[in-house]
């Protein structure tokens, strides 16, 4: 199983990215959810503008699909500057980063997605650029090689990562602002779904938006993807308008249940319950039982189930919680 093939995957495809870009909020006033992040960024941005400074370097981390790229775009728009976008894997050589840095205008934003994947060589170039707005470049080779310093305009680096723990300490410590994005609450997701529906020219009831939001795993990217598939269903099977009943029919047909679980989520939970009596079960046995790689279980399937309280990871193995038993209408065994 490939994570990107799942309807409830938080990862993004290139085509999807282009569609989502059109419906993203452009300013903090339009930004829904993440109230602490929003209120803090309002102050930091306003203070930087009052002083006439570039905003401090910003690190944004959290699960995929929660709006790290959206927030970077909002920062650039609020500051009234250009946004230059790249990613850690793309910056293979020090020269790749140097080319981007030397093309920045004063106060511009450089956004590096997947910043935890920067190579050590590129990261070393970034340190003086972040601290002193200087670029150290080696000219020539061998004994004749010499270092020259190039002054850079003040700029803001925004780094985004799903794995903050993978950042080196020297890099992490150079960010003046660090923001963590959390899974969204259902009312906020409902607002996002309604807003996206309006952008798409859809007739959708509040209850229909709520039904999509409930099944979106706390993630705006998934909410927008489910909305597009519900739209298809409504246009083909009905008159195009989306009620709660139409949304539920569409998502049931797509095998996304009331908790936002798909076939693979349910397969894993039912294996623990039916084949291993609720657990504990070792990871290798569980992987063999459902025909998946252990890495897929650890990195793709487990995190959301654990976060929502349906699965426990214990020293003896994985266990289904009472909530998991109840989800399938199965009576959990009596505890000894």
From Swiss-Prot:
SUPFAM superfamilies: P-loop containing nucleoside triphosphate hydrolases, Winged helix' DNA-binding domain. Has 3 domains, the large (RuvB-L) and small ATPase (RuvB-S) domains and the C-terminal head (RuvB-H) domain. The head domain binds DNA, while the ATPase domains jointly bind ATP, ADP or are empty depending on the state of the subunit in the translocation cycle. During a single DNA translocation step the structure of each domain remains the same, but their relative positions change. ATP binds at residues 23-24, 65, 68-70, 131-133, 174, 184, 221. DNA binds at residues 294, 313, 318. The keyword Cytoplasm applies. Its EC number is 3.6.4.-. GO terms for cellular component: cytoplasm; Holliday junction resolvase complex. It comes from the Bacteria. Keywords: ATP-binding, Cytoplasm, DNA damage, DNA recombination, DNA repair, DNA-binding, Hydrolase, Nucleotide-binding. This is Holliday junction branch migration complex subunit RuvB. Residues 185-255 are annotated as: Small ATPAse domain (RuvB-S). Homohexamer. Forms an RuvA(8)-RuvB(12)-Holliday junction (HJ) complex. HJ DNA is sandwiched between 2 RuvA tetramers; dsDNA enters through RuvA and exits via RuvB. An RuvB hexamer assembles on each DNA strand where it exits the tetramer. Each RuvB hexamer is contacted by two RuvA subunits (via domain III) on 2 adjacent RuvB subunits; this complex drives branch migration. In the full resolvosome a probable DNA-RuvA(4)-RuvB(12)-RuvC(2) complex forms which resolves the HJ. Gene3D superfamilies: 1.10.8.60, P-loop containing nucleotide triphosphate hydrolases, Winged helix-like DNA-binding domain superfamily/Winged helix DNA-binding domain. It comes from Klebsiella pneumoniae (strain 342). It is found in: Cytoplasm. It catalyses: ATP + H2O = ADP + phosphate + H(+). Belongs to the RuvB family. Residues 258-336 are annotated as: Head domain (RuvB-H). Mg(2+) binds at residue 69. One of its GO terms (biological process) is DNA repair. CDD domains: AAA (cd00009).
